[in-house]
Regions:
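N-terminal, motif-rich segments that launch catalysis or mediate targeting to/interaction with membranes
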Residues: 15-132, 136, 152-235, 241-245, ...
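Sec-dependent N-terminal signal peptides
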Residues: 4-13
Length: 322
């Protein structure tokens, strides 16, 4: 398992990751069909705030860490890992063993497990369980969109680029979020085979790795070591972090790569929620006890979402001060 991930969760770095998860979870609500979207909007504060719960669990649950990634290039999967890893979990266990899969990552299993529980909760009108599993599912699906969740070189530690993980998924979004276009014009799509689709997402993420590592090398070379890094005192230790100048330059070097992946992630989260609702028979109980005022507020906020003004109007919950 990844001890680094536990360090990030317990320390200062994870708070930046929280921003991205909360933002993506909120954005996933707006494109949903009106009835389902209204249900999630009525419970928006919970959905957004609990989007980070799987990361928080890492502190106390030793089984949690491996649920957030799949190191596709691990030796156990062989050179043809892009095509050879079975999507069916039982077949994967038979081929590699459960211990090997747990070591290299279980995010496909966790997505499918939580998805099935969400479908069950929708079918049986288990309101609280729907919200619980929807929040968790959104987190795991979003994590699968992060390239560094698909490789043994998950923090650049194998290529002398340590710190890449938090740089890509946290520091750049935190620095540049206000410049992002948060509206995505596509409606949620029904996912007929979630088990296969999550592997498609992971392969997309994995294909982004070369560009990321190359960009880090080029920006560091252009700025020089002194402008690329700073020494910071954290928890009684002096540690090296990327400078603000480097973070901006790296984000600029990648162009729309990070914001596009973030918005694509929110669309896929929305699609997983929608598909679970459809697989449960599109239950109508989701519209129970929702006021006319809440419906009007949802429609008004969707207008702000479409005009990319959630930040300027103060509606993006992840930016609210506690």
């Amino acid at each position: 398992m990844r001890k680094l991930s536990l360090v990030l969760v317990c320390g200062f770095l994870v708070s930046w990751g929280f921003l991205a998860h909360k933002t993506l979870q909120q954005l996933a609500i707006y494109p949903l069909p009106s009835d389902l979207g209204l249900f999630f909007y009525a419970n928006q504060d919970y959905i957004v705030e609990q989007s980070i719960r799987p990361d928080v669990r890492r502190k106390d649950d030793k089984t949690e860490d491996s649920k957030h990634y799949l190191d596709m290039d691990a030796a156990v999967f062989g050179p043809n890992y892009r095509t050879d890893i079975p999507h069916d979990f039982k077949q994967a266990v038979a081929k590699y063993s459960f211990d090997s899969l747990r070591k290299e990552g279980l995010v496909p299993l966790e997505v499918n497990r939580v998805y099935a529980r969400l479908v069950h909760a929708f079918k049986n009108e288990m309101r609280d369980s729907v919200l619980f599993y929807a929040a968790d599912l959104g987190h795991y699906v979003a994590d699968a969109h992060v390239p560094l969740h698909t490789t043994k070189n998950h923090d650049g530690q194998l290529t002398n680029q340590k710190g890449m993980h938090v740089l890509w998924e946290s520091l750049v979004p935190e620095a540049q979020l206000k410049n992002y276009t948060l509206f995505y014009p596509k409606v949620p799509e029904y996912i007929a085979k979630p088990q296969d689709f999550i592997f498609q997402i992971l392969l997309e993420s994995h294909a982004m790795l070369p560009e990321m590592f190359k960009a880090e090398t080029e920006v560091r070379k252009a700025l020089g070591e002194e402008k690329s890094f700073k020494m910071v005192e954290r928890y009684g230790k002096t540690q090296r972090y990327y400078t603000d100048e480097f973070i901006q330059a790296f984000g600029d070097k990648l162009g729309t790569s990070i914001p596009n992946r973030m918005i694509q992630s929110s669309h896929r989260v929305s699609s997983f929620w929608y598909s679970a609702w459809k697989d449960a028979g599109s239950p109508t109980w989701v519209t129970k006890d929702i006021s006319l005022e809440k419906k009007a507020a949802f429609e008004a906020e969707k207008v702000q979402w479409r005009s990319n003004s959630l930040i300027s109007t103060g509606k993006l919950i992840s930016l609210h001060k506690k």
